[in-house]
Amino acid sequence: MKYDFLSKIPTDTKKIDYHHKKNIVKCATKIIKHFIDYDEVVTVAEMQSGKTEVMKRLIYLIRTHNDKLRSLNIEIDKYNIYLVLCASSINLKEQLKIKLPEIKHKIYHLNDIINFIKNEYENESLFLSMSDSSLIIFDECHCDIECSKTIDKFRTILDSYAKDNSTTYYKVGFSATPYEQVVAGFPKAIMKPGKGYYGIKDMFELNENSKPILFQAKDLTETDQVEDFFREISIDSWYYIFRLPGKNSSKETVINNIINYLRKNRIKFDSYIYDMNYRSNINDLIKNKPSKPTIIFIKEKLRLGEYLDTKYIYLVHDDPDNGHTHTTAQSLLGRCCGYHKKSHQTVIYCDYEKAWEHYQWIINDYDIDYIPTNAKYIKSNKQTKTNCMY
């Protein structure tokens, strides 16, 4: 059969070669088959479920079975594969370089793309290569999808080069929340998680003897809600992670309210303020079990593909009312998903309604009819807004 090579596993596969696992192989096969008829595919996968392994499998197929792909009229050069991270996370870029050493010199994040666009003439050879018989992987493809923003400008330049030179390039997006791409009608490949995965579905589908994991977040700028919150939880020698609100005045209020409550109740504790833009990986802070309750206040970001080791985390607390569903799913809730995390039983306070919306989308196989109502660039009639690039 002409497609058999897509599911073929090398005989020297090692246990750590996750990109040859059954669920990964199945998803990569779907993507390649879509490329026979389309030049762009969107891949949907749950948070921290192994989408990078699908990328690795695609790289393997393109390099190992290039002639067979060309026989299917899929024209991708062996070494013309790029990964564009549609966000400006340096940590995530470095993680991807480690996981995908095959293309480590062709992994770019948003700031790199901005520089390429600003200096288009100097980067002409790069644009020519990227627009000719290439595969461009767009990681976290739900980000930066507004018209005239960086990714839109970047793709417009590539399309222009491809048109002028009569070339073709292939695109595959990866995200847990590509609501807009699904509404726009892109062919999708669904990656089901492998054995040992723990995600939003598991958090909602507890058996009757299990303690609840998900709770509605509190407004911690209000002292009465801070007191209610601490009455609901246990205080012990674990990590307690709080995302701070956007406004500086609210940040200070939340910090003071929590610190004052602990001091008033004579609880000995440690505390840190973590900003991923200026500090090393947060996992360096939490790799050892603390000797006393330890509060970590997170400024700005910690979402998207950032990995969070939850082994010693008792609780994470996110914003109580996010404007968009993808923000809830991709934030601390999403960071608590992953393989072999169920036993950690980390308690999650988040925007419960939006978490429920995303859960409904998952259990209905990412169907367009179950797209969350609070998606950023989608109208109530399930059409993308005019300011969306799709």
UniProtKB/Swiss-Prot annotation:
InterPro entries named in the record: P-loop_NTPase
Protein name from the UniProt record: Uncharacterized protein L594
Organism this protein belongs to: Acanthamoeba polyphaga mimivirus
